[in-house]
């Protein structure tokens, strides 16, 4: 009797563990997340790339690079013309044959104009950076296109006038009895020709800057 009572007490003290019942053939369907629409994500990414702020920022970066190259080219043209001179090895008691840019007012104007253009392009770099940071801002872009147009005209004027003088120095003018001097002053003519070519390159870059600014100011529909 004692053994039976002890066994019944153990049965009462042990917790009863109920196993979950499995419904055979009646399992619940698993819930899956809907598949991601990759086409929609790619379309959204393309729209962000083709947004006005996106392509205008790219134009502003290209503008900054061209502006930096144009500034270096204009200052190089002014420095080359200002440092070009040549003195012939023979001279007389009263004459010394020397060629310098200060002998011709056109060459002096060339140095002044290209120095101004190079300084302007250097000072305009912060405005170009503003256009990169704020590609939709209109006032800095409008300021740049106006100033670039003026500087392009000045550069073309100085380069064209100096090119005419360099042409006369190389070929002369028989109707005006102007003799070519580049046979005697070869180094001087070579230096001035290089400066004129650099100035025309700077003018071409300024023209591209004007086109870029006009393209950036274009309104998108």
Swiss-Prot record:
Loss of function: phenotype: Disorganised deposition of Casparian strips.
Transmembrane annotation, as ranges: 59-79, 110-130, 149-169, 195-215
Extracellular side: 80-109, 170-194
Cytoplasmic topological intervals: 1-58, 131-148, 216-221
Gene Ontology MF terms in the entry: protein homodimerization activity
BP GO annotations: cell wall modification; cell-cell junction assembly; positive regulation of amyloid-beta formation; proteolysis; regulation of protein stability
Keyword Nucleotide-binding: no
GO CC annotations, alphabetized: Casparian strip; plasma membrane
Membrane topology, record value: Multi-pass membrane protein
Residues bearing glycans: 173
Matches recorded under Pfam families: CASP_dom
Oligomeric form and interacting partners: Homodimer and heterodimers with other CASP proteins. Interacts with CASP1, CASP2, CASP4 and CASP5.
Function: Regulates membrane-cell wall junctions and localized cell wall deposition. Required for establishment of the Casparian strip membrane domain (CSD) and the subsequent formation of Casparian strips, a cell wall modification of the root endodermis that determines an apoplastic barrier between the intraorganismal apoplasm and the extraorganismal apoplasm and prevents lateral diffusion.
Family assignment from sequence similarity: Belongs to the Casparian strip membrane proteins (CASP) family.
Protein name: Casparian strip membrane protein 3
Organism name: Arabidopsis thaliana (Mouse-ear cress)
Gene: CASP3
